[in-house]
């Protein structure tokens, strides 16, 4: 049986790992074993954070909508409830964009939501108890 030499493949593999780990600090960019470990971790972090990014953006949009809604004297919860009752189908991404770029349009949406909201039965009445 012929002898198999793996030097070329091994060097190619090591070179590709070291090339991918170029921006890392210290030994992680120079030593193959450390670079390989770090590359495995980095790819796992990238995979995890691509999914986490979606939730982070949703949180950002909600906080922006809430801030703009409170500037118009309504809470985020009531705004979303009113928009749903009015049949306005605007997602949070676009709603946050409207809140920042076009405050007048956002105020119009708030008015639509207010009109569609049912009267709050738990709201304090004008009489003193």
UniProtKB/Swiss-Prot annotation:
GO CC annotation: ribonucleoprotein complex; ribosome
Pfam families per record: Ribosomal_L20
Organism encoding this protein: Mycobacterium marinum (strain ATCC BAA-535 / M)
Gene3D superfamilies: 6.10.160.10, Ribosomal protein L20 (1.10.1900.20)
Name used for this protein in its record: Large ribosomal subunit protein bL20
GO MF annotation list: rRNA binding; structural constituent of ribosome
Key word DNA damage present: no
Disulfide links within the chain: none
Function: Binds directly to 23S ribosomal RNA and is necessary for the in vitro assembly process of the 50S ribosomal subunit. It is not involved in the protein synthesizing functions of that subunit.
GO biological process: ribosomal large subunit assembly; translation
Keyword tRNA processing included in the entry's annotation: no
Underlying gene: rplT
Keyword terms, alphabetized: Ribonucleoprotein, Ribosomal protein, RNA-binding, rRNA-binding
NCBIfam families for the chain: rplT_bact
Entry-linked InterPro entries: Ribosomal_bL20 (IPR005813), RIBOSOMAL_L20_CS (IPR049946), Ribosomal_protein_bL20_C (IPR035566)
Family from the record: Belongs to the bacterial ribosomal protein bL20 family.
């Amino acid at each position: 049986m012929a002898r198999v030499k793996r030097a070329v493949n091994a060097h190619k593999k090591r070179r590709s790992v070291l090339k991918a780990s170029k921006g890392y600090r210290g030994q992680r960019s120079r030593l193959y074993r450390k670079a390989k470990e770090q590359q495995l971790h980095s790819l796992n972090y990238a995979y995890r954070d691509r999914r986490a990014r979606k939730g982070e953006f949703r949180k950002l949009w909600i906080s922006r909508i809430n801030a703009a809604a409170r500037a118009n004297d309504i809470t985020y919860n009531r705004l979303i409830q009113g928009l749903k009752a009015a049949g306005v189908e605007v997602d949070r991404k676009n709603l946050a964009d409207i809140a920042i770029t076009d405050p007048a349009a956002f105020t119009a949406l708030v008015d639509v939501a207010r009109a569609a909201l049912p009267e709050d039965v738990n709201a304090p009445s004008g009489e003193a108890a």
